[in-house]
């Protein structure tokens, strides 16, 4: 019986042959000769004996008849792989099916070992990751962080070269971390570059990659895609990214991001990633300023789409929103109601295989990524691959990602603006009132938050192929804040014990011109900081909650988890949950950067009636940690209200400011976020 943990070794050193040593314990797969590629079959004994001296563990691989891999092998090993391309999606779907349909872990190991040296390394990583997440007999395996396996997606090529040099020349115990420069993609002449720390943050890009891994939009096994409220989660997670990005823009004296409304306008911003793909051995193509989109006709990618197609799909989606229903493939009306409308729209706009009618409403969001990522070579005349917008692990580095998603969010907001506003009765919690709220950092002034820079080291050795083994560290600079605590004083006058759902949001107080924000603008800038259940005793209550407990974020250790060092004990419920926990907003980016003189924000806290919000289900283990943006593994989303409640709809009539929106179970307080331009080293 194969040990399922050995499957994780197949992620190590993705471009090396499968029979090379892997893992911290020097482990080798005993690959049957018939599984080797033509290049290595004649010399396998020689190579394996060379590796064999140091081996601590051997993994037997059973020889079985291999399913038809022609479709997965149709993508070259040195091509770029993108989930946004329909051809690549079909190829990935086929490989996922093959991995999912293997009867046992033994058979899965055999097929994975056979496929590993024959299919594209990034495709292999994606398909095996999805299969391990969804197969009942492999759930609970901790997938290695994508940044460790493919460091080239996160680090510029100069640093990669220095890391190669370090690992080749210096013995493992003496190696020094290689510092990633802070300003390597542009200079301050480009105002957009002020946001480098957000767009190029390793944790944020890993969150986006991991979210799409947990919520794939295509697979022939529908259950892999059809998770609870995944369309709504697509809307909400990306809406929150835009709200957070806009708060960062205010923290750098920039206006809110403008949506990419007219697809025929030039894209003002250029982007030069300065990264090389180790799989394709090519540089990621840049996009020059004022590039226009063109119709795509790339035979090699089986792509033939016109800008007119995107415009038609957009118009049909708007028409459906204004009519209040969409037409499914059988001609039936599917209502866009308060309960499920946003979920239907999310699957339709993204689009996933759950879309009610892909023929009519198309594939707007995914194709937008494709159009932008091929803007530099729309007909494949220069044989160039896609830019960073074509890959979920790199897309958030590009300023145009936020313009495109603001445009997508505007379509969702059109639907939300047509729903009836929440009434005071829907918002109020009779008998429960908040007396006061305060935020404190250790030893700081009340209601003042502080951010600064921090340098952290991440081990990238799994992704460095054809080099001596041992740790290779990259040191990167990221935003960090002093931890803080919310203190909420509230009264329960109902005379009995009650349960409340505490919802914490924050938004800038003033707009770009320094004017107090109107409620209808401010609601779309609200970033969710936390959401948790609390019991309310009769009479006065004081609730304290630490910022590190947030339902939005995961701790640093989990974003960059070292799978060997801090793995929970084998077989425990905690271990089962460890992997899903890779999805979540990085805790170091919980609050915006702020300004040296302080960014004026308003903190909003609401306690809603948990009886109305509760979902009856068991949540074992710790993986509801980042449920707000990621949901909970194999469970329903743990909140009955719409995502973003109470700010997901326009306010009731007569409410033009946040203060008029409040009911007794809500409270606001002004908070100041100061940025100190100092850099501290993260304690190891």
UniProtKB/Swiss-Prot annotation:
Active site: 350
Gene Ontology cellular-component annotations: cytosol; extracellular region; extracellular space
Principal localisation: secreted
PTM comment text: Upon activation, a trypsin type protease cleaves prophenol oxidase to yield the active enzyme.
EC top class named in words: oxidoreductase
Propeptide: 1-50
Cofactor note text: Binds 2 copper ions per subunit.
SUPFAM superfamilies documented for this protein: Di-copper centre-containing domain, E set domains, Hemocyanin, N-terminal domain
Enzyme Commission code: 1.14.18.1
Binding site for Cu cation B: 365, 369, 405
Keyword Glycoprotein among UniProt keywords: yes
Molecular function as annotated in GO: catechol oxidase activity; metal ion binding; tyrosinase activity
Highest taxon listed in the record's lineage: Eukaryota
Cofactor: Cu(2+)
Keyword Transferase tagged: no
Positions of disulphide bridges: 581-623, 583-630
Subcellular localization, as worded in the UniProt entry: Secreted
Glycosylation sites: 448, 492, 665, 677
Pfam families recorded: Hemocyanin_C, Hemocyanin_M, Hemocyanin_N
Keywords recorded for this protein, A-Z: Copper, Disulfide bond, Glycoprotein, Melanin biosynthesis, Metal-binding, Monooxygenase, Oxidoreductase, Secreted, Zymogen
Gene Ontology BP terms: defense response to fungus; defense response to Gram-positive bacterium; dopamine metabolic process; hemolymph coagulation; melanin biosynthetic process; melanization defense response; melanotic encapsulation of foreign target
Binding site for Cu cation A: 208, 212, 238
Entry similarity comment: Belongs to the tyrosinase family.
Family matches, as PANTHER family: LARVAL STORAGE PROTEIN/PHENOLOXIDASE, PHENOLOXIDASE 2-RELATED
Function in brief: This is a copper-containing oxidase that functions in the formation of pigments such as melanins and other polyphenolic compounds. Catalyzes the rate-limiting conversions of tyrosine to DOPA, DOPA to DOPA-quinone and possibly 5,6 dihydroxyindole to indole-5'6 quinonee.
Name of this chain's protein: Phenoloxidase 2
UniProt gene name: PPO2
